[in-house]
Regions:
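Mid-to-C-terminal alpha-helical segments outside catalytic/metal-binding sites
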Residues: 4, 8, 14, 28, ...
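Catalytic pocket-lining loop regions of alpha/beta-barrel enzymes
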Residues: 145-259
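N-terminal carbohydrate-binding/catalytic regions of secreted carbohydrate-active enzymes
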Residues: 47-87
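Hydrophobic faces of well-ordered beta-strands that scaffold small-molecule active sites
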Residues: 43-47, 67-69, 92-95, 129-131, ...
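Active-site beta-loop-alpha junctions enriched in small/polar residues
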Residues: 48, 72-73, 95-101, 133-136, ...
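Active-site gating/metal-coordination segments in enzymes
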Residues: 74-168, 225
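A general structural detector for well-ordered alpha-helical segments in enzyme core domains, enriched
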Residues: 55-58, 79-83, 114-121, 154-158, ...
């Protein structure tokens, strides 16, 4: 898939980091020809697929060769799977996450019928993973808080299905449930767990969890944004552009354990372009010898698409 760059700064329509990226792309030398910063191919680990057409355009413009997709506010397991059938670069994950109004009561009463639904979805062989499962998610605009134990019957059932079908699981678990998440990882050492946004943990907790749990993968979606709407502490950037050297050091020490993502949700072309531009800027700061693993290799291996 050949990436298409914005032809003018106004095409990107985004402030901050995305505009800086576009400005760099469009810098003109004396002979009048544009200098184009090469787009780094990457596999996006985190997309809420609300608009498949917008997603396809964004992937082409910003170098995403593949994307893990699951539902958003305007989609479902069925619509995600339909899109993936027509766009083979999309990697569908099945979700029964409790933020869904229809599913939350089942989580509250530990209803095994919901696990049977997930089992039926996975038995089709069409899905390459499970998630995003927001077991413990702080409240946000339009998103009610969820707070279910990673050791509870529902998460345990999900992990057992992941083991049965040999699939990775993406979980959103905040640091308030860190001990239970650690215990879950120990209980299912053979199940790869993708930690969405790395639980927004600080550096020392990221290092500790990765050292103690070899089946844990730290996913960086929303951590590379210049600003995060929930907390300025959630970004790993020290000034909106440069990654903290300590974070780069950890990522390059453990390159097989990190994934990149956009957390795209297709609210607007401008907001999504910011997210994709932030991934490109982050990847440029990683040394080339380890960049390919973080950008693509780790995720494609987890979902069975590695060459």
């Amino acid at each position: 898939m050949k990436p298409l760059l914005p032809s003018r700064a106004s095409d990107a329509g985004v402030p901050g980091l995305a505009c800086l990226f576009v400005a760099a792309v469009l810098a003109l030398p004396a002979h009048g020809q544009p200098v184009v910063d090469a787009v780094i191919p990457f596999a996006d680990a985190h997309v809420h697929l609300n608009d498949p057409a917008m997603q396809r355009d964004l992937m082409q413009r910003w170098g995403a060769t593949h994307a893990v997709v699951f539902w958003g506010g305007r989609s479902s397991n069925e619509s995600v799977l339909d899109a993936a059938r027509s766009q083979p670069e999309l990697i569908p994950f099945a979700s029964i996450s409790p933020e869904r109004t229809a599913y939350r009561p089942a989580w509250e009463r530990d209803d095994p019928a919901l696990l049977h639904q997930l089992d039926a979805l996975l038995a089709s062989g069409a899905f390459r993973g499970i998630g995003e499962i927001a077991a413990a998610h702080f409240p946000a605009a339009g998103f009610a808080e969820t707070d279910f134990s990673p050791l509870g019957p529902m998460m345990t059932g999900i992990m057992e299905l992941a083991r049965k079908y040999r699939l990775p699981v993406m979980v959103h678990v905040e640091s308030t449930r860190l001990q239970e998440l650690a215990a879950m990882l120990l209980r299912f050492p053979d199940v790869p767990v993708i930690w969405a946004h790395g639980g927004y943990t600080p550096l020392f907790l990221a290092r500790r969890m990765l050292q103690q749990h070899p089946n844990l993968y730290y996913e960086l979606s929303a951590r590379t944004w210049p600003r995060h709407p929930r907390s300025p502490d959630y970004t790993i950037l020290r000034d909106g552009v440069e990654v903290w050297p300590e974070w780069l050091q950890l990522i390059e020490q453990m390159p097989g354990r990190f994934l990149v993502g956009t957390d795209a949700s297709h609210r607007s072309p401008a907001s999504e372009a910011m997210k994709f531009a932030s991934v490109q800027d982050f990847l440029r700061q990683i040394r080339p010898p380890v960049r390919e693993q973080v950008a693509r290799g780790n995720l494609l291996r987890l979902v069975g698409l590695a060459p």
